[in-house]
Amino acid sequence: MECSPTERILALFDLMRDWFDSKNFYGCVFINAVAEHEKSNGWIQEVANSHREKITAKLQAMVAASGAQDPEMVTEKLNLLIDGTIVTAMVTANSEIAHIGKLAAGDILRNAQ
């Protein structure tokens, strides 16, 4: 079954919920590494930023394919939402936050048309 770009973006939050429910969920290794080390430790931020750039490029391609008016801004909003969803799930140990994130992502995508 073929999914629309919007459905693919929203499905990311379903995947996150599965990840949050797994016994091996400890948050994002990149967020954790940057948070736990000195800001002067540039190589950790370089690795994290490299990962983020790759993920952002893939997400922005999906956002552009969804017909969003400003794919770059919409992608930044979604990145912020994804990061917040991951951190909140880690802090609260509540995988339901992924559903709330999915609803918010739907709002962002609808408003971007």
Predicted regions and their residues:
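Short alpha-helical scaffolding segments that buttress acidic/His motifs in well-ordered protein cores
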Residues: F13-M16, F30-V34, L78, I82-T85
